[in-house]
Amino acid sequence: MHSLLVLFVSLLALGALKKHLDFRAAVDKIHNYPGLRFIFGVQSFIFGKRIPYFAAGGLSLWDTKHQDFVDHDADIISSVNIFPTCATYMIADAQAIKEITTNRARFPKPLQQYKILTFFGSNIVVTEADEWKRHRKISAPSFSERNNRLVWDETINIVKELSDDVWRGKNEVTMDNIVDLTVPIALFVIGVAGFGRRMSWVEDFTVPAGHSMPFKDALHLVSNHLWMKVLLPAWFLRSAPIPRVRKFHTAYEDLEKYMIEMIQARKTAEKKEERYDLFSSLLDANEEETDGNTKLSDSELMGNIFIYLIAGHETTAHTLAFTFILLALYQDEQEKLYQHIKSVVPDDRLPAYEEMGKLTYCYAMLLETLRMFPPVNLIPKQAAEDTTLHTSNMAGEPVAVPCLAGTALAIHTPGLHYNPRYWEDPFAFKPARFLGDWPRDAFLPFSAGPRSCLGRRFSETEAVAVLTYIVARWRIDVKEEPQFAGETFEQRKARLLDSKSAITLYPVRAPLVFKRR
C-alpha cells in the first residue's frame, strides 16, 4: 500500500513538474510579454467569472472589456494558462487587427477550434486556403440583392402578422423576456429567406410522413439547443435518460431529413421555380458550377446552410433583443428613432425596401447596439510565420510585440469596441456616433477582411425592417416589477443588460412592455 502511495505521489509530482516546464516554455515563447497568467484559461467553461491567477473565466472578455489592456498599458497583451497550456496574444489595436484580418496566409484561422461546426458537413467557416475559396465561390452568390429584398419583404410580413393578428385588440403586450419575441421573429425570417419555408405565428401541427415533428419545431429546437450537440457525445444524445435531450436529438435528425429532402426535390424538379432564398440559391449555384472539383457535396451544402441558420438566427435575435432593451431604457433615443422613422415612412404605410438607405438613424441604432454588445467576444487566429505585431501603450508610445510561428492570437472584440482610443465615452449609448465619420477598422461585429461574414447584409436588413415596423407602431417600456421598486437607473440598466455568452452574447432576462401608439 505504501509503495502504491509513493508511486502515485511520484507520478503526480512528475505531472506537475511537466506542466510547470510547459508553462515556462509558453511564457518564454512570447519573451514573457506582459499580460495575464492563470491556471485555467478561458477555454475552461467550468469557470464563468474570473478568479485572479486561478481561472480566466469564460465571460472575462465581456466582463473586463478594455480594462485588462489599461491595466497592462498596451492594446496587445498576453494571456498564458496551464490548463490548457498555451500562450495567446489578446489584441484590441485596430491597426494590428486590420493587418491580421487582411492577411489570411500569414494569420490563418485555427481550424481545429471550429471542428465542432461540422455537424452536417464541411462549410465555409471551418475551411481555409483553396478549400475555403471553393466554398465561398458557391456560397457568396446566394447573398444577393434579390435575397436582401426577400428578407425585407418577408420580415415586414412577419412583424405585421404579429402586430395585426397575434396582438389584435391589445393596446399593451408584456414580454417576460424579450428574447421570447426576437427569437421566433428571427426563426421565421431564416425559415422563409433562408430555407424557403414560410412559417406562421399560428401553431402548426402538420407532420409530414417520415418525420417526427413539423419543420418549424425542428428548426426551433435545433437552433435554440445547439449547445447539446457541442457538449454532449452522440451516444448520450441517442439514449439520454433526459427527455429534453432526446427531443433535441430527434429534432436534429428530423432537420437533417428535411434538408436532404429539399436538396433532392430541387435536384429532381423538371422545372425549377425561380426562388431567392439562401438554400435554393445555394443549390442553383452548385448545379450551375461546371467544374466538378468545385461543386459541393450534399453534406457540404447542408453544412453551409446550417452555418447560415446559426449565424443568422442567433446573431439577429439577440442583437434585436439588446436594441429593444436599450430603447426601453433610453426613452429620448426611442423618441428620436420614432420621429426619424415617421419622417421617412409617413401615414402608417408599410416601409419599402428602397427606403432602407434613408433610415439612417435606425441603422445607426443597430450599429451602436452591435458595438456595445458584439455577438462574439473573441475571434481566434494564429501566426503562420515569425513576425512582429505593433501597438502602442496608453501614452501613445510604440510597442513591438514578438510573435513566433504557431503563436495563438485572439481578436478581443469587447476590448476593441470599448477602446477609448477609437470610441469617445465608449460605455455611453450614442447611436448618433454612427451618423458621420466613424472608425470602421475598430468595429468588428461581423469580423473583417476577406473572411468577414457573408450574411452581414441579411442580418442588417432584417433588423432594420423589424425596428422600423415595430417602433412606428409600438412604444417600448421596461416592465415594472414590485421587487425592483426603488432601483436606480444604473441598477435597472445593469439588471436588464445582464448578459451571458453561449454561441453568441445574449441578455439573461429583460421583461419589456409594448404599448400601441
Swiss-Prot record:
- Any one GO MF annotation of this record: iron ion binding
Q: Which InterPro entries match?
A: Cyt_P450 (IPR001128), Cyt_P450_CS (IPR017972), Cyt_P450_E_grp-I (IPR002401), Cyt_P450_sf (IPR036396), Cytochrome_P450_monoxygenase (IPR050121)
Q: Which residues bind heme?
A: 453
Q: Where are the transmembrane segments?
A: 3-23
Which SUPFAM superfamilies does the UniProt record give? Cytochrome P450
Which branch of life, at top level?
Answer: Eukaryota
Keyword Repressor applies: no
Is Transmembrane helix a UniProt keyword of this protein?
yes
Q: Which cysteines are joined by disulfide bonds?
A: none
Q: What is its main location?
A: membrane
Q: What does this protein do?
A: Cytochrome P450 monooxygenase that is able to use trans-stilbene as a substrate for oxidation.
This protein is called: Cytochrome P450 monooxygenase 124
Give the source lineage, highest ranks first.
Answer: Eukaryota, Fungi, Dikarya, Basidiomycota, Agaricomycotina
